[in-house]
Amino acid sequence: MSIIIDRINQEQMRQDHPDFRPGDTVAVHIRIIEGSKERVQLFQGVVIKRQKGTMDASYTVRKISHGVGVEKTFALHNPRIEKIEVITRGRVRRSRLYYLRDLRGKAARIRERSLRR
């Protein structure tokens, strides 16, 4: 039984997403269907949480919109997500960045991670 479930999960999993971590700024392109119309909406912000797993893997992105903090949680293997772009790589020392909810302005900045390769 477990082999069948694993095989179904492998078929449903997406492999085209980039490698990103908490602290990275990402732009998530989401396909939205309203009635008969279909459009792509962009949600750009900082990844504050990454929940690992197989099919139930998810991540939370936070942005400030008109002075109000907005957080959205996305399933990693969601078929409605067109693509995920990594804008900048952030350098943080925590895996859950919930403390950013209390910070405003310059205090909420995240240092950029240098890529040494």
UniProtKB/Swiss-Prot annotation:
Disulfide-bonded cysteines: none
Assigned GO CC terms: cytosolic large ribosomal subunit
PROSITE patterns: RIBOSOMAL_L19
Name the record gives this protein: Large ribosomal subunit protein bL19
Entry's Gene Ontology BP terms: translation
Originating species: Desulfotalea psychrophila (strain LSv54 / DSM 12343)
Biological role stated in the UniProt entry: This protein is located at the 30S-50S ribosomal subunit interface and may play a role in the structure and function of the aminoacyl-tRNA binding site.
Record keywords, A-Z: Ribonucleoprotein, Ribosomal protein
GO molecular function: structural constituent of ribosome
Family from the record: Belongs to the bacterial ribosomal protein bL19 family.
